């Protein structure tokens, strides 16, 4: 889970830093905030005690869902005045990792929650 959150964070920071997304009004600061959130979630999923790990994984799942939804909205109708194109840099890897974070994170959180209930 940490790797997925970290990868999403890295993609957003790279787009912000190397591809000029920092200059897009409203979207630029959100990309930097998104990168920071991914780092926090990656660290949290590694250092939280076992009883809270399902919460961290659920956070990674929500993070993946939110970033995936944002990119899809920006592709289809635009988001905050910005419309993404299908030729955008890192678009395919971003969609793949965000979808994986959502699906794997949700499954891992449910499994961890179930396992915690069995041990209680």
Where do the model's predicted regions map?
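Membrane-interface extramembranous regions
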Residues: 1-120
């Amino acid at each position: 889970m940490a790797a997925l959150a970290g990868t999403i964070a890295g993609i957003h920071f790279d787009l912000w830093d190397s591809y000029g997304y920092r200059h897009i009004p409203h979207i630029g600061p959100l990309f930097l905030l998104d990168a920071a959130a991914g780092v926090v979630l990656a660290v949290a999923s590694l250092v939280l005690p076992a009883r809270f790990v399902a919460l961290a994984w659920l956070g990674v799942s929500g993070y993946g869902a939110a970033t995936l939804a944002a990119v899809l909205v920006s592709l289809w109708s635009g988001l905050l005045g910005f419309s993404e194109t299908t030729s955008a840099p890192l678009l395919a890897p971003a969609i793949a990792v965000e979808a994986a974070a959502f699906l794997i994170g949700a499954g891992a959180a449910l499994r961890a929650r179930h396992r915690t209930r069995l041990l209680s």
